[in-house]
Amino acid sequence: METSYREEEARRKASLLHCIFFFLLGALAMAAAIAVLHESSYWEWRCNRLTDIVVDGDDGDGPSSSEVVDGGGEWGMVRTRGAQFVVGGGRPFYVNGFNTYWLMVLAVDPSTRGKVTEVFRQAAAVGLTVCRTWAFNDGGWRALQKSPGVYDEEVFKALDFVVSEARKHKIRLILPLINNWDDYGGKAQYVRWAQAAAAGAGADAFFSDETVRGYFKSHVTAVLTRVNAYTGVAYRDDPTIMAWELMNEPRCASDPTGDTLQAWIAEMAFHVKSVDPAHLLGVGAEGFYGPSSPPARLRVNPNADVALAGADFVRNHRVLGVDFASVHVYPDTWLPAGATKEAQLRFATSWVEAHIADAEGALGGMPVLFAEFGVSTRGARAAFNATSRDAFIEAVYGAMLRSTRRGGGGAGALLWQVFPEGTDYMDDGYAVVLPRAAATAGIVAAHSRRLQSFNSRCAWSCRWGCNKRDNDTAETTTAEADVDVSFHHEL
């Protein structure tokens, strides 16, 4: 009897211990799940999305024409955390975007203003989230800035309209502030205004002439502090604007050492941040490797001449105030004439991968945006047609996705360029008219869906795929954000 009693007592104790064990295990699992949900931005995102739907009056299936809710949610300012763009409470924001540079000019005329709305509507339909377009037109036809500090209010209102329409379609904007080239005025127009050319100075005097630099700083201030006539929101306070770019494709071939351009970038980055510390800032560079680059990187350049253009990818993006790296991809115009389609595809892939590696390594974990990529389907050099161009688009998207899947620095790419129907007279061979290019539109939409699957993930699940260095960088960035989120500290 005593033995049986002891055996029964032992069984009861074992059963009790099992119950306690499984209870504690369940409690730990529940605590971990609560911690994960608390850390993630999922519930914050859902709340913000539901608020958007209630306020906008849409059903969640597409963009609304009403005001977008701001605050710290889905439509707050885009920021950087480590090698990624983030929105809201830290939700990743991988970019699938496009260029349509002429939006402001067409918005001036009521008869063509509808093209702005049309291109945003078509872009949003395939999931494009960022548009890069000019915030300048210096001198000449429909000039925004007619002379130094003198602006055409109707053209400024046209830019206001572009920003307002982008907001309605939930498309963010990247706005370059001047052109390296003569189109839309560019740096040469500033030099002419300052009459520096009378002393034999070329367009590169833009970077060194004190009067010219003063003109440009005044223009920067005028644009950044502009109050939108449609929304009543100052540009520097508007989260519709994702980022400013100092210049479209800056080069200073008159000083191949790169020192002149480097000094200008540093000066202007400081000025932009002094006026608008809230928005991201990019250089607008093409990504050429210059004199400070190791031989292995110089060999990545498409030709030897670009190393003497005065630009220097890594050095230019180490400047205080520059928040992300920018690169362009044009194998058809950069590679030697006669380069085959296969050679151009290989170059595009290696060019993208090299810059992602440098953004993660040499730049200490900085997002890199491929702000222009495209090939022409016209002209004697064209190796692609409207159909085979899809292979180039897929090559760039593929390189981006490989980075995205591992939590790398490839933050997005913007196709050059999306046109609505009825604008063929402006097409130089690079235009993609989405309604007439079903296969291309399908590729773009599929890439948008893939990126959205990453953008919709909670912050913790994105970090799960990153290596420890990226996590440490993200934590450091978060800690520093309370002090100053406006500057990427020079290495």
Swiss-Prot record:
The keyword Signal is annotated on this UniProt entry: yes
Cited Gene3D superfamilies: Glycosidases
Residues binding substrate: W134, N248, Y330, W416
GO terms for MF: mannan endo-1,4-beta-mannosidase activity
Biological-process GO terms, alphabetical: polysaccharide catabolic process
Residues forming the catalytic site: E249 (proton donor), E372 (nucleophile)
InterPro entries: Glyco_hydro_5, Glycoside_hydrolase_SF, MAN-like
GO cellular component terms listed in the entry, alphabetical order: extracellular region
Assigned EC number: 3.2.1.78
Domain of life: Eukaryota
Keyword vocabulary terms for this entry: Glycoprotein, Glycosidase, Hydrolase, Secreted, Signal
Expression across tissues: Expression not detected.
Reactions catalysed: Random hydrolysis of (1->4)-beta-D-mannosidic linkages in mannans, galactomannans and glucomannans
Subcellular localization(s) per the UniProt record: Secreted
KW Transcription (keyword) present: no
Family stated for the protein in its record: Belongs to the glycosyl hydrolase 5 (cellulase A) family.
Annotated protein name in UniProt: Putative mannan endo-1,4-beta-mannosidase 5
Annotated organism of origin: Oryza sativa subsp. japonica (Rice)
